[in-house]
Amino acid sequence: ISTTSFFPAKPLGCYGDGGAVFTDNDEWASIINSLKVHGKGSFKYDNVRIGMNSRLDTLQAAILQVKFRAFIDYELTDINKAAVEYTERLKGIVKTPIIPDGFYSSWAQYTIKLKDKEQRDELQTYLKEQGIPAMVYYPNPMHLQTAYKDLGYQKGDFPITEKLCNCVLSLPMHPYITTAEIEKVIDTIAKYLKG
């Protein structure tokens, strides 16, 4: 089973909210289809489980159909070229994402790893002062979020996750980013860190 989000900021986003679930298991597909339509059973007005209204509306589906063509035709290639530019120019300055040979990414974010939270936060502030947006998307690890409190996890149970939440920063990234924009981001990071 796999999922994807069609949130507008995602690489393949619609103009509203949306997502998809993929499976090659017929039983799971049946349950997922039921859950997305209020928990519907085999009879339209018999809800056999608690579900939700999460069908993708036809307008969003039409938008995605057009965007999917652009995504396949050039956006995926362009965003991977941008990632290569970032990675090559940031070598030796910060830790960059690693994509194994034979794979590629759709790059929802290009996230760098810094020394610690203090350095990350200071760099983010400096980039903002220079007119460069940089984001911390996941400041709190999942195991420490309120929704999972009943699982009994404590701070320190997942030290790598906790460290990453404190030291990663996402840089501007989209298929239409220019080499000049990437160079400005990299030069600004290098200037700050080599300060």
Residue spans for each PLM region:
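Short beta-strand-to-turn element immediately C-terminal to the catalytic PLP-Schiff-base lysine
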Residues: 5, 19-24
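Conserved active-site segment immediately N-terminal to the catalytic lysine
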Residues: 1-13, 43-46
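PLP-dependent aminotransferase class I/II
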Residues: 24-195
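Adenylate-forming
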Residues: 14-18, 62-64
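Short glycine-enriched loop/turn motifs at secondary-structure junctions
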Residues: 12-16, 104-106
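Short, glycine/charged-enriched secondary-structure capping and boundary segments
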Residues: 17-19, 185-186
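Alpha-helical hydrophobic/aromatic positions enriched in membrane-embedded helices and signal peptides
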Residues: 9, 16-17, 49, 164
